[in-house]
Amino acid sequence: MTAKVFYDELHQYALSHQKNGKPYLGEYQDEKNGEWLKGDNPRSSFYNHSTFCDLVINDLIGFKPRLDNAFGFYPLIPEGKWDWFVLDNISYHGRTLKVMWDATGKKYNKGKGLRVYAEGKEIYRAANLKPAIIKLK
């Protein structure tokens, strides 16, 4: 699957998180027409669990846990689609991490590109969103 295909499908999924113009995420949605099939069953509207967050964190942003003292970074964000994001307060292997992307350097005022911090100290920097194994220092 390409980054563009994943991004487009995730974007469509995110847009489906509404019903009658209000935020909503139910249990069953018709894959062809997008209609919510469970109706107004109260149980249905609390069905999100963690899957959407997993898709964003592990797949779109690309944070991939590992057993060693590193993590994989394999983003599926097509070039030019997101100018910025921050994934903060990641509890990982006894450390607190931050993954920050700023295409222009103007959103977070820390410079252009990708930066990774452990305990507030920069441990990795890259000019673009490219796959990497990032070792904790």
Residue ranges and their predicted role:
Residues N89-K137:
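C-terminal beta-sandwich/jelly-roll accessory domains of carbohydrate-active enzymes
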Residues M1-K98, T104-Y108:
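C-terminal capping/lid segments that line or modulate ligand- or cofactor-binding pockets
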